[in-house]
Amino acid sequence: MMSASESRLSTLFTHKALNATAVASLVGALVALTLYAFDSRELLGVSVWEKPLKFLLSALAYTATFSWLYSFVDRRKKFANLMGNLIALLLIVELMAIVGMASAGLTSHFNVSSPFHIGIWSLMATAISVVWGATFILGMSLWNSQLMSRDLRLAVRWALGIALAGMGIAFTMTPPQPQQIEPENWAGIAGAHTVGAADGGPGLPFFGWSTEAGDLRISHFFGLHSIQVLP
């Protein structure tokens, strides 16, 4: 027998796979936070657990939000459910890669230093590309939902558009920079997020966003998480 609070939650957050990924992300974030406090190892000048913690929190917000939005899907429900399942599964793949590499003291993003690292990076890039496509399709299922008020529907449309654009900014970070492919500068890295300077300079605490140059991660973050704010 469900309690009243459990019943309300099951009505609000209706996609089982997205709920499962949200719970897994929450548990993972709590573990990463604990390790962040007690594991002194560093990678690129910060705790090895900083990146996993950020991505786990982001995945928690993302999956919980889309589980809530799924409750407003009023057409092609089975197909929308399939897209939600795909998002949930591939985010788990992405998170496992990030957490696994960090726990070994290795970078995940932009790392092409060996066939193994290229494989991990390619897997991550493929997974998140499919997540983008599945999010777009799920968003189309919500576009004309009659289960929302007119104002909420308009807010969700704007939020989806901005979130998809924000997610898309990540793709602009992946091409190798000219200096990275010069033989004398080769360091096994292909891609960057800083504009006008090399990655790894001074940045904001925890977020790491550059304080000396442009940083594509800022627009990526605020674009992606507009879906939690606008509706």
What are these regions (language model features)?
Residues 175-226:
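Membrane-interfacial catalytic/cofactor-binding modules of polytopic membrane enzymes
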Residues 17-37, 49-72, 84-103, 123-138, ...:
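Hydrophobic cores of alpha-helical transmembrane segments in multi-pass integral membrane proteins
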Residues 12-15, 77-88, 149-156:
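Membrane-interfacial loop-to-helix junctions in multi-pass inner-membrane proteins
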Residues 1-14:
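Short, Lys/Arg-rich, polar N-terminal cytosolic tail immediately upstream
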Residues 43-52, 110-123, 151-154, 183-184, ...:
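Non-cytosolic membrane-interface motifs at loop->transmembrane helix junctions
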Residues 131-190:
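Hydrophobic, aromatic-enriched interface-forming segments
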Residues 109-147:
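Internal, conserved structured core segments that host functional sites
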Residues 10-11, 113, 206-211:
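Helix-boundary and loop/linker segments of multi-pass membrane transporters
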